[in-house]
């Protein structure tokens, strides 16, 4: 049985973060689609988040979001409590031969801080949208590196306590991290190596230029839609299946990069998800390969029979 957070208003008593009931979530996502959060909570800091975790029954769903850059929130919204990490979780500090970053710190901002400190190895982060928390949750990677190659440890809020886990305990693999169910990443330490600031910045400029040339970075999109199958590139399979420019409602496959879905202005989450499923079906029919979603899809569907997990 799922219990509504509003059935127990005392859950939020004396918490310092902001509480909003029936909060629209579309403005919080890069796709600009999705329904409402039954209750949206922006914790002031880690203590605020842990207090909430201790108070909330397991019967109340709790969803953690950050920048929501690689996420589709379905049109029926999110039940229970949606926790959005922001201020209070975005501190970035230099720590010897590494960087410690809060979960809400933007990947690109962490890369920039490392560059200014003369620390190399995190340049790839400037080409990844979203936050450090999300990057860890999916072992994000690009341009020859990934989180698994630089993560030292991660601190998690779980059941109201903070636990520090070494990277070796997360079973990091391609776009996967074995995080404990119900946890929230709060901060992490990333390894670096000494480097020349000018060289690091030049490398980041090259990455940004390559990204701008190949991806629809100024569109309403959610990053790579599907994981690359072993030894193959998803975009090539999608293109070969005739899906470049394919549309469904207000959703469209990018003409610039076939592994990106776009909200052309009036898309719903159902449009995007249905288009993704059509791509999967066409690729399967074309070459026999099953594409798996990289974009995370959460929430309550809005009566769209073609949207399947």
From Swiss-Prot:
Main location: cytoplasm
Family note: Belongs to the MurB family.
Active site as annotated: 175, 224, 294
Pathway the protein contributes to: Cell wall biogenesis; peptidoglycan biosynthesis
Domain FAD-binding PCMH-type span(s) in chain numbering: 33-195
Any GO MF annotation of the entry: UDP-N-acetylmuramate dehydrogenase activity
Function noted in UniProt: Cell wall formation.
Protein name according to UniProt: UDP-N-acetylenolpyruvoylglucosamine reductase
Keywords: Cell cycle, Cell division, Cell shape, Cell wall biogenesis/degradation, Cytoplasm, FAD, Flavoprotein, NADP, Oxidoreductase, Peptidoglycan synthesis
Reaction(s) catalysed (UniProt annotation): UDP-N-acetyl-alpha-D-muramate + NADP(+) = UDP-N-acetyl-3-O-(1-carboxyvinyl)-alpha-D-glucosamine + NADPH + H(+)
GO biological process: cell division; cell wall organization; peptidoglycan biosynthetic process; regulation of cell shape
NCBIfam families reported in the protein's UniProt record: murB, PRK13905.1
UniProt keyword NAD, yes or no: no
GO CC, any one term: cytosol
Cysteines paired by S-S bonds: none
Pfam family, one: FAD_binding_4
The EC number(s) this enzyme carries: 1.3.1.98
Cofactors demanded by this protein: FAD
The encoding gene: murB
Enzyme class, UniProt record, top EC level: oxidoreductase
Matches recorded under InterPro entries: FAD-bd_PCMH, FAD-bd_PCMH-like_sf, FAD-bd_PCMH_sub1, FAD-bd_PCMH_sub2, MurB, MurB_C, MurB_C_sf, Oxid_FAD_bind_N
Domain of life: Bacteria
Origin organism lineage: Bacteria, Pseudomonadati, Pseudomonadota, Alphaproteobacteria, Acetobacterales
Subcellular location: Cytoplasm
Species the sequence originates in: Granulibacter bethesdensis (strain ATCC BAA-1260 / CGDNIH1)
């Amino acid at each position: 049985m799922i219990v509504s957070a509003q059935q127990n208003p005392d859950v939020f008593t004396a918490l310092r973060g902001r509480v909003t009931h029936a909060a629209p979530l579309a403005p919080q996502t890069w796709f600009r689609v999705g329904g409402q959060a039954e209750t949206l909570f922006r914790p002031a800091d880690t203590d605020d988040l842990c207090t909430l975790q201790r108070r909330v029954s397991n019967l109340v769903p709790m969803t953690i979001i950050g920048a929501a850059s690689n996420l589709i929130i379905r049109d029926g919204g999110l039940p229970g409590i949606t926790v959005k990490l922001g201020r209070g979780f975005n501190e970035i500090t230099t720590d010897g031969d590494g960087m410690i970053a809060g979960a809400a710190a933007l990947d690109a901002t962490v890369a920039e801080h490392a560059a200014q400190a003369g620390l190399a190895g995190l340049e790839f982060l400037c080409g990844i949208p979203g936050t450090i928390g999300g990057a860890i949750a999916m072992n994000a990677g690009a341009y020859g590196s990934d989180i698994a190659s630089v993560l030292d440890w991660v601190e998690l809020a779980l059941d109201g306590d903070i636990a520090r886990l070494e990277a070796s305990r997360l079973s990091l693999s391609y776009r996967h991290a074995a995080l404990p169910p119900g946890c929230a990443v709060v901060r992490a330490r990333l390894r670096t190596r000494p480097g020349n600031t000018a060289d690091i910045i030049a490398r980041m400029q090259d990455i940004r230029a390559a990204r701008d040339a190949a991806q629809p970075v100024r569109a309403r999109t959610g990053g790579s839609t599907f994981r690359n199958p072993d030894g193959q590139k998803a975009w090539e399979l999608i293109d070969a299946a005739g899906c470049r420019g394919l549309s469904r409602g207000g959703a469209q496959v990018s003409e610039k990069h076939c592994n990106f879905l776009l909200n052309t202005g009036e898309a719903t989450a159902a449009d995007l998800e249905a288009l993704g499923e059509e791509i999967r079906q066409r690729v399967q029919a074309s070459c026999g390969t099953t594409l798996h979603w990289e974009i995370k899809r959460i929430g309550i569907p809005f009566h769209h029979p073609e949207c399947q997990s």
